Curated annotation (Swiss-Prot):
Principal EC category: transferase
An annotated GO BP: DNA restriction-modification system
Keywords, ordered alphabetically: DNA-binding, Methyltransferase, Restriction system, Transferase
Gene behind this protein: mjaIVMP
EC number: 2.1.1.72
Name this polypeptide is given: Type II methyltransferase M.MjaIV
GO molecular function: DNA binding; site-specific DNA-methyltransferase (adenine-specific) activity
Amino acid sequence: MQKNQTIFLNTWKFLITLHQKPWSTFFTKIPDFPHVLLKDIAKVGVGLVSGFDEAFLLNEDDISKLNEDEKQLIKNFVKAKNCKRFVVEGFVQYILIEDNLKDEEIFKTKYPNIYKKLLKFKDRMENRYLPKNKKWFNWQALRNYKFLIKNLNKKRIYVPTLDRKPYNRFSLGDDELLPSGDVIFIQPYNDDDIYFLLGYLNSSFFRNYYLANGGRRGGRVAFTQKLLENAKIPTFSDEVKEKIKNIVKDIIYNLKNGKDIENLERQIDYIIVSAINNNQFKGYQTTLKNLLKPKLKG
């Protein structure tokens, strides 16, 4: 047996253990590997914060009362509870009032039913922390809003900002979705990277790398913009990335059809560790400039 095969088999035994001990930081001393930072190949950002979800949340009865102008303010949001690991299930609907709406009389006239709904919460909404240029009916923080709207037709990866689950819940959402304040979004600059990233970020390898690099918050894992932006993403060969991509597609298919995915997840871990031990990386002739293309709008 070759030396690198011995290293791999020993590491594979540890991977089996890590499935049973998901809070382990075994990889604290893992040797460095050829990589790019996640921020070099994807936009990583925080979600939109209303500051008072109860007021902006819509149910079917609310929606039935809205006029056509008011329906244009309805947006579909991904919350932490919708992140099921690999896939987003469902969404919640909120009234989203953009910051350029400042005149309360215009608001009241053009959106009477929404105005009436929000008016019930006015006193409490005024007690939110709001920048001086915002009105009581505005959202608290529309961070990354222009970027998100410009790229609303693209799929994104979402992950809860805080999680007690013993596994990562990076989840792929369809287009026309926005991130709420309790999730982080990841938008690859190259659409082809989305399935590879989804597989890698949900792997046991990445979970333990992330925990070892500051992601632990007591009994929870904290996925922050800063930590994720600076996470190392291996520059695997195209062959390795394609294998992971295809397995992730199989995982999503199985999840949508009520089938088990455990063996497929273990295959991803196997491929990642094997690729690192056997130096299956792209040549260094690939420049960062090329990795950053094509850039998204915004």
